[in-house]
Amino acid sequence: MRNAGGDKPFSTPVLLREMGLKTHVDDDPKTKAYRLIGYAAVTFSTVSVICFCVTMPVVFTYVQSVKRQMSHEMATCNVNARQIFDDVAALRAGFPFAQAGNRTARQAGYDVHPSKPTPVGYSGGDAAAAEVKGNSPAAAYEDKPFVAVGVEEGPHTATTGSDSEGTCHDCCLPGPPGPPGPPGRPGPNGKAGANGLNGNPGRPPEAPCEPVTPPPCPPCPAGPKGAPGQAGYPGADGQPGSQGDNGEKGSDGAAGEKGRPGPLGKIGEPGATGETGENAENSEPTPGPQGPPGAIGPVGSRGTPGHPGEDGEAGAPGAPGENGTDGENGEDGVPGVPGHDGKAGRAGERGICPKYCAKDGGIFFEDGTRR
């Protein structure tokens, strides 16, 4: 059976499926299994894409928040570390010890700022204390101006290395402490450091170490004036003032030069109508000379068509025409309903495969016969 175009034949299952009838192909378990697997694969793929579209923005937002929080904590940690190193450097330089020989120089572990004096008591004998620059983070602050803080029982005052003479120049009290920062998270435990070298044997005490109280600093003079600030924005426009008095009349000016000739004036209006002339005298008319022939006029427009004439008498019948070409084949009809199952066929012939063969030549079959 072919389609309307006659190009490709239709199979019976396809025609039945187009008609809405079930075939034995639809009841095939393999087809059902493949169809179920296809539906499941499409469903899982769609759910996976939807989950990815929903989860990706959430993960991106969480990563951004964690990154922002880590940056804030790192900045806070750097500020706290810098403050600790500043305080340690200030405390190391702010303890003046008495002239006692009961302290020996340490070999390692202390960073000495190049601009601060060597504390008394940290040198052994006549040897000067050497400047030690380690790889500790405190070495990063050597370029900053050094400020030593003296420690005593009273209020804290700032001191410098020139306090040995009892005077204080260009020193000011420190400003008020800033607001406390947010509490940081406890850091991990550091690794255990290496054991230090054995210290030198101590000397017998000669005199008790008493802190020397530095004299109070005089009030600092007023600083120089700062640079003038930037010019402010222009103010709003003021209200309009009152009208002023009329000025005095000026003197007459000099006579001007002769002006240029003006343009031509407009054409005057027509004059009044004159008086009526006298009537001519009656006389016989005299024909004038004949004029030249005029030009040929244009062709006139086409006239309207006349009324149609009456029909003539019918002519003799003509000869019959030739047979026309055959028309195209019509479309195939709707296929019929499949017929009923045929009658069961007769029983098949017995098989020729024996069940077993005896040694004496007999052949036995499953139905008990022997040949």
Swiss-Prot record:
Keywords in alphabetical order: Disulfide bond, Membrane, Nucleus, Repeat, Transmembrane, Transmembrane helix
Bias (Pro residues) ranges: 174-186, 202-222
InterPro entries: Col_cuticle_N (IPR002486), Collagen (IPR008160)
GO biological process: collagen and cuticulin-based cuticle development
Chain spans, region Disordered: 108-127, 153-371
Main location: membrane
Compartment(s): Membrane; Nucleus
GO CC term (a single one): nucleus
Sequence ranges assigned to domain Collagen-like in this UniProt record: 223-280
Biased composition (Low complexity): 188-201, 223-240, 314-323
Record-level Gene Ontology MF annotations: structural constituent of cuticle
Pfam families, sorted: Col_cuticle_N (PF01484), Collagen (PF01391)
Source organism superkingdom: Eukaryota
Ranges annotated as spanning the membrane: 38-60
PANTHER family reported for this sequence: COLLAGEN, CUTICLE COLLAGEN 71
Family classification: Belongs to the cuticular collagen family.
The protein's name: Cuticle collagen 71
Organism for this UniProt entry: Caenorhabditis elegans
